[in-house]
Amino acid sequence: MEKFIAELEQCRLAELEAYLKATGLSNTTLSSDEENALNAFNGKNSGGNTPCGLTWQSFKLGDLFEVLSSKKIYRANTIKIHDTQIENSYPYVVRAATNNGIKGFIIDDPIFANEKNTLSFAQDTFTVFYQKQPYFTGNKVKILKPKFAFKSPKILHFISAILQFILKPLIWGLGSTTESIAEFKFSLPLKPTAKTQTLKDIDFHFMRTFINALMKQTIQGVVQYSNAKMQATKEAISQEAPTQKDSLF
């Protein structure tokens, strides 16, 4: 029984290590920078700047991204879509609001795949997702290619969350064009030392650090839940384990 419990614990630890590796984290302990980022966003220890104790500035989407058309449009009723990724396949991104907009995976010449480390922008549903792999798209999906130097996917996670929030009130069928997408305005945090309000003053370091902190907090919650389940399993096994009785002979 002890061996069985030990195997369960090893399995749990292996899953945690795999998740940490996938997210690029080595542990779930918040660094001082990450704690400061959370405090700043929550308005703690701030100098009164708003919102969230940070200085924010409005930018046009076109200031930070090139708004590009997909290299090729794939219609779902004319292609073979795989539920899981197989060899030589790439994500097929559509206007869905879940699973990063990925409907499945398709195989075609990679020359038609859009660049990885970009954002997909659904024109009718106004959903925005970070895409970590090269990908194909369905109809009415634009590609947002960063004009700034790409340093971390976490920065694009931060920006996509901001865009998703401000675009949420827009309704299906409203429509959009390359030009109108480039004109969308949204706010980003500025560096504490910023004296101007230009692209070079955007605090990309804060964005990356803040997302890191959120990921660690999420994993901490999963670990606590997993620990509670493990303890409950141990107790259940202990109660069900047969008690050895004295021999009759």
Language-model features, listed with the residues they occupy:
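Non-catalytic DNA-recognition/assembly elements of restriction-modification systems
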Residues: 2-99, 194-249
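A general structural signal for short secondary-structure boundary/capping elements
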Residues: 33-37, 137-143, 165-169, 188-192, ...
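DNA target-recognition domains and sequence-specific DNA-contacting regions of bacterial/archaeal
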Residues: 57, 62-186
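A cross-kingdom feature marking solvent-exposed beta-strand/loop segments within repeated
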Residues: 169-205, 220
